[in-house]
């Protein structure tokens, strides 16, 4: 018994749940907005399936005498206009099947795996594996995507829509919105290439090349607009309600598309060649490709659907990468427009979007370039030149990944606001700065020596302020631990008289009573633990000669010419070694008669190390290193 596309085997997701319907219900729900998704459809098949449904619904409505509103209306239109060509599998060999030409007389008919019917190419190293049979639903999706396949070698020519990169518009949720928007764009299209040398078509079958006798490489100018072509493939029934495929493996495509442009409204076009913009050969999926697909560029014309479709709130960019009969991958990106506001990216909005895109791409380029010098700073050139280059490449790649999608989403959101060049640039700069901070945090996390990392941070901070007007290091909000230690140190300092300080300074190994009285202000839990108590005992000796307040410990160590190697050792040490180096730094301050110094960070360093709080410890290390590096840099600049 033949399988018809009007039989209820297509699973759809609707507001009430999931159900199985025929093609007429799919078309009806596409136009009433209740079709949410196809659970059985792969994501890479979305653009081909939406295109097939949009072309079909556009043509059915064009050649119908009355509006198509209900499922029964669509069924009547399908039956009256396509008739026996609604058979998916099991029809007469001498008549066309849905999306399948008559193969009799075209050559040897051979069995064909159902996977190769689709547009992806199966292989042992691909996710997609070869299958000989499939359900009617899977086979239907494969047929709709069939002519999107590129040339697959001898006997497997490409289809007319081979590997098109597409831009679909809708509400960002339902597939119905994308089908209806694209169908409306076809309604409004005036073709420039397709059908320019042919008579006006009179019926839907004129557009369905699979419903006509096979012609090899028929010029696109002689075909009606729009059309659905085919490959030399047919489905045949298999056991268990499944279907398999047969093929005539001959060269020669059904359509000679010339440049490849067949006036599809959702396809960006290359300015230089007039052909479709594709992910071919060296062009890979990237943020630049996505910007060009939606905003256009000097090399790419925006797809006309952005002007022709009714107001929409999202754009979906899809593409398949390929090279020499090899599928590289499938990519898709969804973007909100105007913060969810329904609008059209028409001529005026399109021009503004194009200008915003140029500025956003420039910001991404500048942000990536900002990493060059700073990323090479933490690594000695003689030993780690190759290593630093690898880290630089990784950091720039990570930054571009973060900014790529964000840059296009940001400018699409800005369309909801009135034009304001300065405000827009501030938004773009803030976006770049936020990404640079995150990438830099990860990039420097593995640097063993904090001082070179601090110098690199200062270099990046300067570049960010110069290019984006944004700092790398935002104002440090005091942590609860830091605030508490800061308050304790001020309390200790306030209660120490000159006599108390003299007593502490003159003490040898044992702390005097004055020191223990000062230590009474320390947190009890720290004094109960030997490791944290040692930190407080060491720092109270500093208060014998140094007042709490003024410059940070890093800046003071730099001012007193404390050796850089000792600072690095201090910041990298742990446990008892750290306590010893803190004591050494304290003695250095006292011996150099430092009058005022904010000791908070060095206490936080010791306490967090003892507690095993690595995150808080790294923050303290960073503050000390930055203070030291900043003061050294200032002194060298002044020299």
Which ranges hold each PLM region?
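Cys/His-coordinated zinc-binding microdomains
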Residues: 135-138
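Gly/Ser/Thr-rich loops at beta-strand to alpha-helix junctions
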Residues: 141
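Extended alpha-helical scaffolding segments
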Residues: 1-124, 133, 144, 149-480, ...
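Flanking scaffold residues of small Cys/His-coordinated metal-binding clusters
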Residues: 129
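Basic, alpha-helical nucleic-acid-binding regions used in initiation and control of genome expression
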Residues: 152-153, 477-542, 546-639
